[in-house]
A protein has these predicted regions:
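Active-site His/acidic residue clusters
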Residues: 1-4
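Metal-dependent phosphoesterase/phosphodiesterase active-site architecture
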Residues: 7, 11-19, 26-142
Length: 142
């Protein structure tokens, strides 16, 4: 891990108020990380819909911490200690975190009247959002 390059990347993303979007993952999550240059919001979407009737998550995690590593110790056990250290260093910077095993799709929208951005996350092929996150609020520095 190159700390100087990592800091430079964090600065670029935060100073531009860019949102990091990721898809085709196995979990839906939203994380907001504070940096000296402002917050960074990352949205991960579980776009692999194996069960079109799964409209409620089996598991919801709201605490960012070492349980990400310890929950699956069999995955790359040789890197477990390093991953624990990375999570430990990152945890104090996390202001908001939500993760769930819910496949679906997300829609980012901006309200024309108040210029507020929000994410609506729909379970499977649902017609009503299961989760709504105020992205504008997360992008406001604390």
């Amino acid at each position: 891990q190159d700390n100087a390059k990592r800091e430079q990347l964090l600065q670029i993303i935060a100073s531009q108020q860019a949102i990091v979007l990721c898809a085709h993952l196995h979990l839906y999550s939203v994380v907001c990380r504070d940096t000296p240059w402002g917050p960074i919001v990352q949205i991960l979407v579980n776009s692999v819909i194996k069960d079109k009737n799964m409209l409620v998550p089996k598991n919801v995690v709201a605490d960012y911490g070492p349980e990400f590593v310890t929950a699956h110790p069999q995955w790359q056990p040789s890197t477990l200690q390093q991953r624990m250290e990375w999570i430990d260093k990152e945890t104090p910077h996390i202001r908001f975190f939500k993760q769930m095993d819910l496949p679906g799709y997300g829609i980012l929208s901006i309200n024309k009247e108040n210029n507020k951005m929000q994410l609506e996350y729909y379970a499977a092929f649902g017609e009503k959002p299961y989760d709504t996150v105020n992205i504008s609020e997360l992008l406001t520095s604390n």
